Amino acid sequence: MFKVIKKEGKARRGVFTCAHGGEVQTPVFMNVGTQAAIKGGVSAIDLKERLGTQIELSNTYHLHLRPGDDVVRQMGGLHKFMRWDGPILTDSGGFQVFSLSGLRKISEEGVTFASHLDGHRIFMGPEESMRIQSNLGSDIAMAFDECVENPAPYDYAKASCERTLRWLERCKKEHDRLNALSDTVNPGQMLFGINQGATYADLRIWHMQQIAKIDCDGYAIGGLAVGEPTEVMYEIIDAVEPYMPADKPRYLMGVGTPSNIIEGVARGVDFFDCVMPARNARHGKLFTWKGTLNIKNAKYKLDEQPIDPECDCPVCRQFSRAYLRHLFTAEEMLGMRLAVMHNLYFYNKLTERIRDSLDNGCFDAFREEYSKKLAEKI
């Protein structure tokens, strides 16, 4: 399923295999299609044929609400529904549920919350999350967990960790049962456990030690990039990494900037996802190999250059900065689509170049050159 083929320090070059799409080269960035589509008018066809995407990520909570996981199941699963034949990871819905802080009630069984669409009450626990993700037929299901608020009181974070551990045990049991059913959508679906513990290193380490005893197919670090300083995020990764099984993939959830990804790889992380490339693109903020630019700025009005002269994405091969700026100022939907395509391609190319640097034994030099540069504004 997962094999580390080369290392440089803690950075790992690996190959991940799952039911759909054959081999995935890691480190990898997963493109976020929350409701089985990338916001900004980007389809699975774009991901596959134009953007170099390896894995797509969809949202359990949103797909449960609409069209309904039962609808997706009747359509043959998420792969057939959205016409994507590569790997799909579905998150458990926990992050979205727990972000509805004023609308939810937590118990040992799970969480009762109000739909953000129409306010009707919904219950979701470990078993419900596993059943929804089984209906979706994703390649990787994420365990149901609680993502605590930042900052969180120590005692609450500790109790939450303990409950999330018990929930993982229930997830594992239900996941195994569902995979064994004769009519399951994807009998090869994998399960990743999630490390929690807020910003408390001792809780993080304890929790990682406990969930590592449960035989999951991979392990994620969750509950970061929720308002804590970047340095604290890196400290938590450094604290947890030694306790993560070396033979399983490691996933840093919801992170992040290009610099975050480079620094995450340097700390032993294999999988990343973030809404940032698509979200920033929809506001005209574009990533380049010299830093980020705001295409709405007046200085690009007569600029004949592509977004990034170093980029060979479909957008940079065809269109100028001046044209992109015009589309945004005219509020044409095409501007958003082209911007999203460029940013997703950039993120996919970033992880490709990280892999190449690991293959060639020069990741440290790549990190030195780009970790700070990509955070600059131009």
Q: Model segments located where?
A:
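A non-catalytic, amphipathic alpha-helix used as a structural packing/dimerization or gating element
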Residues: 128, 132, 136, 159-170, ...
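Conserved, mostly hydrophobic/aromatic
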Residues: 22, 56, 91, 133, ...
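Non-catalytic, usually N-terminal nucleic-acid engagement modules in DNA/RNA processing proteins
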Residues: 1-185, 298-301
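C-terminal extensions of enzymes
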Residues: 1-17, 24-33, 40-41, 145-151, ...
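Structural signal for hydrophobic packing residues in well-ordered secondary-structure cores
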Residues: 137, 168, 172-175, 179, ...
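Glycine-rich phosphate/ribose-binding loops and adjacent secondary-structure elements
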Residues: 162-165, 174, 178, 186-307
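Glycine- and acidic
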Residues: 150-153, 158, 218-224, 333-336
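Short secondary-structure capping/turn micro-motifs that flank functional sites
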Residues: 64, 149-150, 227-228, 280-281, ...
